[in-house]
Amino acid sequence: MVTYISDYKKLVERQIENEAEMRNRGGKRTETRENKAVEKERESMTTHGKKLLKASIDKFENTIQTFLNENNRGPKFVAKKYLDQLEPRLTAVIAAKKIIDSVTSVRKFTAQAISLGGKIEDELYFQAFSQSPENKALFESINKDLDKRSNHYEYRRWKLLLSSKRKGFEWDRWPVRDKLLVGELLISLFIEATGLVQVEKVFKRKRAYNVLTATKKTLEWIKNVKDFNKFFDPEFYPLICKPRRWKTSIGGGYISRHIEPMFLVTGNNITSHRTYIEELKNYDMPGVYNGLNTLQETPWVVNKHILNVAKTVFNDDSRNRGGLITSKLMELPNKPHNISDKSPEGLKALSKWKSQATIVYTQNQKLKSKRLAEANTIYIGNKFADEKQIYHVGRLCFRDRFYYVTGYFNPQGTDLAKAMHLFANKKPLGTVGEKYLCLQLANTYGEDKISLDDRIKWVHKNKDQIIASAKDPFNNSFWEHADKGFFKLKKKIKN
């Protein structure tokens, strides 16, 4: 008894260390993601950027509306005639997002103002293009296609401009001075409404110019938000001891203070959702809690055979099996010889090459993302390969569906993630269990359209190839042709 208590105490201590590691890895991931957003001038998509955007829109909109209601003369009137064509709310969103996208950077004021004015012109341009009856269907079709491809502003803008020019759409481009006036006005109104940024004069090489920077107060606030939120997005691992049981709507799952108490139902950490979670405490839900606890207290082990196969094929492209993403990316198309030529033929060749290159680039980004997910799956599987038991914390979505919180490596994950899991407590299959194993083997291979009896017969007919694949998956390729290759290989090994 003493030995058992001592061993379990050590297990809990190791689990707490794992949760500290989860927290730190999540913090580094968040920091890396936000640094990339700053580099790409997409700071409005960060945690602090979203908060600034949400807090500034209403005040900024009211300030714009007040300005438009006034009878202005002079340079401001030039900007006013453009802004009158847009809803103040839309103008506020576009301008605030553009300013906040690089809020912690030091930007030359003139360049920032011209760029902001260009964003307003783009909006008016595409509104005019989409509202004409002959172009409306085309605009919607292009946008739908772009939603599947990319959310990068410059790429979307280029595709829409290209399509509008092909349709012969005409537009009087704004003079640079007008873009500057529109941008200057919106920046000054943003400063007036929010006080988040300021214009400063700096001197460099005996020259003076204005820059747009965040105020000292804003920078301090951003630092505090970053420090506070850095560790609120941990990289969830499996547990090596039983999770904390769900007894109420808050606090089940991980066992230490390193992880913030979880909500029973997933959702944004906003007032309305927190109110809903608090309200759930008033309801007696033994069936819900018992079901959750039963699932997350089910012990698993890592399937080492599948793990070793996955590690081998992942790290050696020449032995790739089972549909894993190789390290090789698609090659960009060769540039045409006249790509630098400004003639109509050269410009046409450049446009065609860009279209082809964009498709390849987008596909490569997807491949990189999938390979990274596979790498994380293998990493976590390898980390817990020698544990006698592992557990996965579970929660509910707003539809009351059960989901594990562990990223990448969990029994509800990809073909690879599922295949790397085995129940820790073994039980004999029996006659009925053998029947369902055969059905699952046939299903994962893609033989799921024939009758149940024919599926069982199919398994017995291919028994020798199934066993050969399990014994030597690198020299027997039968399992690779399955719809779910690694899951199929797992079933063969179990058989």
Regions found by a protein language model. Name each.
Residues 1-495:
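Non-catalytic nucleic-acid-binding interfaces of large nucleic-acid enzymes and RNP effectors
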